[in-house]
């Protein structure tokens, strides 16, 4: 992996994570010290999502935006990956010069749904919450990599 494909572990500051789904987009943010990840909002894909995400980026002023990329268990990109990559390109144009990075989002939605179920919340009635929790899971993984100085799951920039 070339250095341009890795999250910049030297940058302090807020990071945003996006879990782009067919109907909803979960958004999460970190604190400036890259310690905590927390849910921000669920954006509906029918409601001009790139514009709303650009507004969130302007509000949080992140050092980078991390987008989850749908990857199958065998490591190949899922069918939805091209749609997510297209959305990532649009977002990159809207928020330039803030970089957009890709991260393998394997199992994040299932992990989020399971965690909500274990917390006693009905996942079917909380779909927007699941999307936010999936974005939090993506971001927590990246923050752990930043703390460890690693970035094995990054899969390239938005132009990949």
UniProtKB/Swiss-Prot annotation:
Keyword Nuclease: yes
Role summary: Could be a nuclease involved in processing of the 5'-end of pre-16S rRNA.
Signal peptide residues on this chain, from the entry's feature table: none
Subcellular location: Cytoplasm
GO cellular component, one term: cytosol
Family to which the UniProt record says this protein belongs: Belongs to the YqgF nuclease family.
InterPro entries xref list: RNaseH-like_sf, YqgF, YqgF/RNaseH-like_dom, YqgF/RNaseH-like_dom_sf
Domain of life: Bacteria
Top EC class of this enzyme: hydrolase
Protein name: Putative pre-16S rRNA nuclease
Pfam families with a match to the protein in the record: RuvX
A GO term for molecular function: nuclease activity
Keyword flag Nucleotide-binding: no
Species annotation: Cutibacterium acnes (strain DSM 16379 / KPA171202) (Propionibacterium acnes)
Matching SUPFAM superfamilies: Ribonuclease H-like
EC numbers on record: 3.1.-.-
BP GO annotations: rRNA 5'-end processing
Protein keywords: Cytoplasm, Hydrolase, Nuclease, Ribosome biogenesis
């Amino acid at each position: 992996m070339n250095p341009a494909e890795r999250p910049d572990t030297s940058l302090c500051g807020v990071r945003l994570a996006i879990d782009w789904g067919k109907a909803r987009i979960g958004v999460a943010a970190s604190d400036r010290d890259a310690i905590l990840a927390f849910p921000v909002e669920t954006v509906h894909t029918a409601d001009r999502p790139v514009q709303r995400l650009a507004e969130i980026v302007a509000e949080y002023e992140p050092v980078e935006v991390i987008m989850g990329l749908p990857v199958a268990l065998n490591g190949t990109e899922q069918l939805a990956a091209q749609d997510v990559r297209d959305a990532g390109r649009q977002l990159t144009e809207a928020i330039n010069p803030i970089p957009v990075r890709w991260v393998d989002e394997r199992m994040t939605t299932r992990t989020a749904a399971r965690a909500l179920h274990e917390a006693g919340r009905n996942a079917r009635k909380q779909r927007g919450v699941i999307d936010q929790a999936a974005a939090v899971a993506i971001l927590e993984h990246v923050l752990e990599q930043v703390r460890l100085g690693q970035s094995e799951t990054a899969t390239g920039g938005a132009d990949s």
